[in-house]
Amino acid sequence: MEIAVLGLGCFWGPEIKFSKLEGVIKTEVGYCGGDSKTVTYKEVCTCNTNHAEVVKLDFDPKIISYEKILNFFFEIHDPTTLNSQGPDFGTQYRSEIFYLSDRQKEIAESVIKKVNLKLSGNVVTKSSLLKNYCPAEEYHQRYLEKR
């Protein structure tokens, strides 16, 4: 089992999309990259905590590779818009890959470079070491499935 943590705008839609990928065992939405270990949705929405909304994936690397997950990540959001996706604006909606190992860092930077070449150098996606991840409140988990 391996873990991927990805920021790509509001976490509700991407969570559903990732959950349908073969090899993804579990998804969880949360907050990552901020200044504190625990945070609430209300606090994140102030844009003062430096957290991003993220989807955390548990996946089987024998079925789907980290690189394929990152390629899908770039397919399902716009990596050229800074701190926004669709109608949502704020630093919590940034495009960011949170890596957990040197190997993930290398893969992330390689994929970002390839996508950047394809998109004429306009990619704003960052890669950062996983820091201060905490799960989002229960009502956010599988939110769109509950509606």
Curated annotation (Swiss-Prot):
It comes from the Bacteria. It holds the Pfam family PMSR. Keywords: Oxidoreductase. GO terms for biological process: protein modification process. Its EC number is 1.8.4.11. Disulfide bonds: none annotated. It catalyses: L-methionyl-[protein] + [thioredoxin]-disulfide + H2O = L-methionyl-(S)-S-oxide-[protein] + [thioredoxin]-dithiol; [thioredoxin]-disulfide + L-methionine + H2O = L-methionine (S)-S-oxide + [thioredoxin]-dithiol. The keyword Oxidoreductase applies. GO terms for molecular function: L-methionine:thioredoxin-disulfide S-oxidoreductase activity; peptide-methionine (S)-S-oxide reductase activity. Belongs to the MsrA Met sulfoxide reductase family. PANTHER family: PEPTIDE METHIONINE SULFOXIDE REDUCTASE, PEPTIDE METHIONINE SULFOXIDE REDUCTASE MSRA 2. This is Peptide methionine sulfoxide reductase MsrA. The lineage of its organism: Bacteria, Pseudomonadati, Pseudomonadota, Alphaproteobacteria, Candidatus Pelagibacterales.
